[in-house]
């Protein structure tokens, strides 16, 4: 696996792969990689002949009081994990390489509607930063396909909409959330948790499961289910940011006759913000 730091080197390496008739897969990351990221690379390697990953902690998607400065940078360990997962090329640019004229004058990409509410409400500007950097990376790599984790459900929806609306010829593949044995969704930010907090954290997924089970049994009072779930999270010592039931494709608030639902949650455990989601499909008997 080669590592390059400039757009020129990146494009030269991809041009060579294209010249050999290879199908290009792409996995954008912010580094501090775990088994969930490895699963994305493995999926890309299954679908493509040449896998490109990027590591870039994107300042545009961090708010003023978020963890940009303390977000872990673990390049050597990340390179080893990417190599083991089947990555062929790593693009690890600097901020100056990505935003040579500075971020203040950078053209922005905004995806309306899907970027609003949920994480977009508590992290204003976040999805504009995500859409902007991903569109730049897509233009640099020009992949045939790109793989994103379903843990960041709203982000995946935003990327799908951007690709569709801007006519980008890229297949977007969602990879199921990778979880620890106790159900906690793997996240680079889990490393911020104390041992006691880590023992508490699986309540997030258990809460989603309980709401999902109730919906599958025919419960349609979504407001009551959400209220119970928020109370359960609070009783465990978490501060819910949001807990909502939405239509799985459009992310509008769920209606009683919807068959494809997603339950989405964000909650603070100490200073660490945990997010997760659970997809629920209802057949005709339960819908």
UniProtKB/Swiss-Prot annotation:
CDD domains in the cross-refs: PanC
Classification via Gene3D superfamilies: HUPs, Pantoate-beta-alanine ligase, C-terminal domain
Example GO molecular function: ATP binding
Stored Pfam families: Pantoate_ligase
Keywords: ATP-binding, Cytoplasm, Ligase, Nucleotide-binding, Pantothenate biosynthesis
Metabolic or biological pathway: Cofactor biosynthesis; (R)-pantothenate biosynthesis; (R)-pantothenate from (R)-pantoate and beta-alanine: step 1/1
Main localization (coarse): cytoplasm
Protein name in the entry: Pantothenate synthetase
Originating gene: panC
